[in-house]
């Protein structure tokens, strides 16, 4: 069984003409997967492409 860690991902995404800041708590195996999961969530929920998301930090909680 793989241990899942909690990561806090901070950044901003393009919402119309402005950038909106976000902070997300992501359960993931490692930092790279947490980053990919964040891109996936924003693409799914907000219809935002990866190029319109800027991740500023990923920290293990």
UniProtKB/Swiss-Prot annotation:
The UniProt family comment states: Belongs to the eukaryotic ribosomal protein eL20 family.
**What keywords are annotated for this sequence in UniProt?**
Ribonucleoprotein, Ribosomal protein, RNA-binding, rRNA-binding
The family database entries (SUPFAM superfamilies) matched by this protein are listed as: RplX-like
Gene field: rpl18a
Q: How does it assemble?
A: Part of the 50S ribosomal subunit. Binds 23S rRNA.
Q: Name one GO molecular function term.
A: structural constituent of ribosome
Protein name per Swiss-Prot or TrEMBL: Large ribosomal subunit protein eL20
Which source organism?
Methanosarcina mazei (strain ATCC BAA-159 / DSM 3647 / Goe1 / Go1 / JCM 11833 / OCM 88) (Methanosarcina frisia)
Query: Do you know which HAMAP family this protein is assigned to?
Result: Ribosomal_eL20 (MF_00273)
Record InterPro entries = Ribosomal_eL20 (IPR028877), Ribosomal_eL20_dom (IPR023573)
Q: Name one GO biological process term.
A: translation
| Highest taxon of the lineage | Archaea
A Gene Ontology cellular-component term: ribosome
Taxonomic classification: Archaea, Methanobacteriati, Methanobacteriota, Stenosarchaea group, Methanomicrobia
